[in-house]
Amino acid sequence: AGQTCDGLGTHQFFNEGKLITNEDSSLAEGAIRGWDRGSVYYFSMLSSVAKHYGFKLETPWKDLPKEHQDKVLYGSGKTKLEFIYINDRGDKVTRNHPFEGVIPNMERRYRDTESQMVREELSKYLSVQPCPSCHGTRLREEARHVLLAEKNLPDITCMPIGEAFDYYTNLQLEGRKGEIAAKIL
């Protein structure tokens, strides 16, 4: 089985194309649903990011430099930013820490939640692609390099059924190769 995909051959990821609701909208107007002015907590985080990197939340998403878009989507790395929070008593509290990023935030919330409703809401932003480790073959690298009469397992499994049947029917392996292959054929 592929190591990254647990043998499924596919990989789910949060697709930034699905996250950006309208490239003409600004972050303040809701370019990223749930991170606009209506969500005080997330919007205050974006305000801190914008202040630190020197851009305006009212700028349309498409007009933000890619560097700023990447900081919003993927975070500040190890760079600490100043965040101001309101605690339970209504006091302002200042904290310095890296910004997680919208996509890592969603990945964490999707992975850690026990709420089916939260998982369903976040799954709207997921896309599926072939696993980057096994390239969709569902096999570890070592298994992908095993040859059977000059064809590897992914090549054989991609054949139409009739062609694969003919391939196996006409397959002749002699000696030691035949002994080894007999166990799996």
Residue map of PLM features:
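Conserved phosphate-binding elements of NTP-dependent enzyme cores
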Residues: 1-185
